[in-house]
């Protein structure tokens, strides 16, 4: 079973508390999502492999560590996942970016996929699927399904806020996918929203209703 890790770094928790406030402006919300994503990126990339390389400093030759050249891909679930991409790219600017577009049917609460655009070599990449919310788990499961159908096998799911129901469903559907979140909240309400949550992340990111 994949792990669910709550990243409790003080800066992440401080910024998340501001993000949750209903009076946080669209501008500040967007900036905070980007900042939290960048901070989380340090944690979720902690196990990237290193190799020894010889370099020349201004003083002498030395053996140092650098990434092995492992290929990375960041795959946001549209719309809201877009807000987390730049934070990750600030750490790994050479990563490729794919897109999986979904919307949630407001009656059934089930996700509907309308776009899949991925790097051709997605099966060779370590993938970070990013979405601010892990609520019912439906979108996350469908996104991982789409990636696996295209040969991907090394996948992590990264969100800002998760509900226990969504974590359980994603772990049951894809036990090989590790989940990273800044907060594990109380529950889902009858409308499928996370409680206490932060509202509709997409609407708050883009100033829509």
Swiss-Prot record:
Pathway: Pyrimidine metabolism; UMP biosynthesis via salvage pathway; UMP from uracil: step 1/1. GO terms for biological process: UMP salvage; uracil salvage. Coiled coil: none annotated. 5-phospho-alpha-D-ribose 1-diphosphate binds at residues 79, 104, 131-139, 200. It catalyses: UMP + diphosphate = 5-phospho-alpha-D-ribose 1-diphosphate + uracil. One of its GO terms (molecular function) is magnesium ion binding. Uracil binds at residues 194, 199-201. Keywords: Allosteric enzyme, Glycosyltransferase, GTP-binding, Magnesium, Nucleotide-binding, Transferase. Binds 1 Mg(2+) ion per subunit. The magnesium is bound as Mg-PRPP. Belongs to the UPRTase family. PANTHER family: ADENINE PHOSPHORIBOSYLTRANSFERASE, URACIL PHOSPHORIBOSYLTRANSFERASE, CHLOROPLASTIC. This is Uracil phosphoribosyltransferase. It comes from Streptococcus uberis (strain ATCC BAA-854 / 0140J). The gene is upp.
